[in-house]
Amino acid sequence: MTQKITVLYAVLLSMALWGCGGGGSSDSVSDKVWYVVGVSIPMSNTTPRSCKLDVDTFADTCADGEFLLDHTTPATFTLTRVDTNTDPGTLALENYTIQYVPMNPNSPVIPSLTVYHTQQLKEGDNTVTLEVMDVERKTTFAALFNSGQQSMTILPVGYTAAYTFNGHNSYGQSWTYHAQAPIFVGEYNECVPCN
């Protein structure tokens, strides 16, 4: 069975809704609310394990060898126009940072990752391939266990992948929003690679 977990619904503001100081809102471009943004990441609880958010950090010895690649997953960014009488333009996703927040404070620290990825987002559903963890972080994580600094008995280790997305809209204004998803990092001992 596959379930879709919505990790964020937020009103995306191009700039502050209210002016500083006295007075109310204005009708300038900088004060508009253009879209309501939803971000969803598909998750699966099927057997065998899901390749969506289970991150395999160990390259196993298989007939052909297990490939150790950057781990990615598809995400759907849904943009719903707030005012149907105006042209909201598009949003450009320019980069995002992932903070790996351990579910157990005694878990190994995984350094944050910044990904420079430019993609135009338009009204409706937009599929974006998100990095979950790159090979550098996978091999650093695995080295802690291979060297004996961490015990294999704690695997898999749960983290919250906290994403901060940054970009600009068609009017050149900056925007930022946040989403998060649980990931489980470990040794899955499978010879069918997940990328």
Briefly describe each language-model feature range.
Residues 16-19:
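C-terminal motif of bacterial Sec signal peptides marking the signal peptidase cleavage site
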Residues 1-8:
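Bacterial N-terminal signal peptides that target proteins for export
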